[in-house]
């Protein structure tokens, strides 16, 4: 029995190591190549389309970093991760606050996630909230910070984050909401998109707002006022 248990544990450990080696190699390749999609994109496409993947899809259009408005970069940093350029992928104080909140609730309800942590989750992981997934998120976060500079991390984030139902990335979002390229977003438009990030489906379609109470207009105003102090990595 113990030998069988040891075999199972060994196989599981080998699988974890192999998976992380794949993540490590994939992220290293993104110094040169752009990721075609993310785990979250693929899951959403399956949710929206089911088996009809030939004629159904998501709106995702990759654009280079310099073709994304500086207004949007500042708005996202001001909203999601004010210390993005200075931390090493995670912020201990925010994670400790999230830990205390989770202990009070008895399960994972908050993650204290930086932009890099959000990117790690979206690229490779499921949307489930549990401590094992959070641990893997931290490992992938380290990999992203090891291989990629801050500008590249922000570029991939802005091109892969969800901004509505089936809408992914800055270019698709700019066209979807404002009928203009991401390079031409104004301060107000950028602030509105950044305000949508915690609940992008709700921002896009009211039917997703049943259990969400967010004043997107008020939040966008706050973000716009903070954009001037946001530090960009370029």
UniProtKB/Swiss-Prot annotation:
Its main location: membrane. GO terms for cellular component: peptidoglycan-based cell wall; plasma membrane. The chain crosses the membrane at residues 8-28. It catalyses: [GlcNAc-(1->4)-Mur2Ac(oyl-L-Ala-gamma-D-Glu-L-Lys-D-Ala-D-Ala)](n)-di-trans,octa-cis-undecaprenyl diphosphate + beta-D-GlcNAc-(1->4)-Mur2Ac(oyl-L-Ala-gamma-D-Glu-L-Lys-D-Ala-D-Ala)-di-trans,octa-cis-undecaprenyl diphosphate = [GlcNAc-(1->4)-Mur2Ac(oyl-L-Ala-gamma-D-Glu-L-Lys-D-Ala-D-Ala)](n+1)-di-trans,octa-cis-undecaprenyl diphosphate + di-trans,octa-cis-undecaprenyl diphosphate + H(+). Disulfide bonds: none annotated. One of its GO terms (molecular function) is peptidoglycan glycosyltransferase activity. It is a single-pass membrane protein. InterPro entries: Glyco_trans_51 (IPR001264), Lysozyme-like_dom_sf (IPR023346), PBP_transglycosylase (IPR036950), Pep_trsgly (IPR011812). It is an enzyme of class 2 (transferase). One of its GO terms (biological process) is cell wall organization. The keyword Cell wall biogenesis/degradation applies. Its EC number is 2.4.99.28. Keywords: Cell inner membrane, Cell membrane, Cell shape, Cell wall biogenesis/degradation, Glycosyltransferase, Membrane, Peptidoglycan synthesis, Transferase, Transmembrane, Transmembrane helix. Pfam families: Transgly. Coiled coil: none annotated. Pathway: Cell wall biogenesis; peptidoglycan biosynthesis. It is found in: Cell inner membrane. Peptidoglycan polymerase that catalyzes glycan chain elongation from lipid-linked precursors. Belongs to the glycosyltransferase 51 family. This is Biosynthetic peptidoglycan transglycosylase. It comes from Ralstonia nicotianae (strain ATCC BAA-1114 / GMI1000) (Ralstonia solanacearum). The gene is mtgA.
């Amino acid at each position: 029995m113990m030998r069988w248990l040891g075999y199972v544990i060994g196989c599981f450990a080998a699988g974890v190591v192999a998976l992380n080696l794949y993540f490590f190699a994939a992220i290293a390749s993104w110094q040169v190549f752009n990721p075609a999609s993310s785990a979250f994109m693929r899951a959403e496409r399956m949710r929206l389309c089911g088996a009809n993947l030939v004629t159904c899809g998501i709106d995702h259009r990759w654009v280079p970093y310099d073709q994304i408005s500086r207004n949007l970069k500042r708005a996202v940093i001001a909203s999601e991760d004010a210390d993005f350029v200075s931390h090493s992928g995670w912020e201990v104080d925010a994670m400790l606050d999230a830990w205390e909140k989770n202990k009070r609730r008895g399960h994972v309800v908050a993650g204290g996630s930086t932009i890099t942590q959000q990117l790690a989750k979206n690229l490779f992981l499921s949307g489930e909230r549990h401590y094992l997934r959070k641990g893997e998120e931290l490992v992938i976060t380290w990999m992203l910070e090891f291989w990629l500079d801050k500008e590249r991390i922000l570029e991939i984030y802005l091109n892969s984050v969800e901004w509505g139902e089936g809408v992914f990335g800055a270019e698709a979002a700019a066209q979807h909401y404002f009928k203009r390229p991401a390079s031409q977003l104004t301060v107000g438009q950028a602030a509105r998109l950044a305000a949508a990030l915690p609940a992008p489906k709700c921002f896009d379609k009211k039917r997703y707002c049943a259990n969400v109470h967010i004043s997107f207009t008020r939040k966008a105003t706050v973000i716009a006022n903070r954009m001037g102090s946001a530090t960009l990595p370029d």
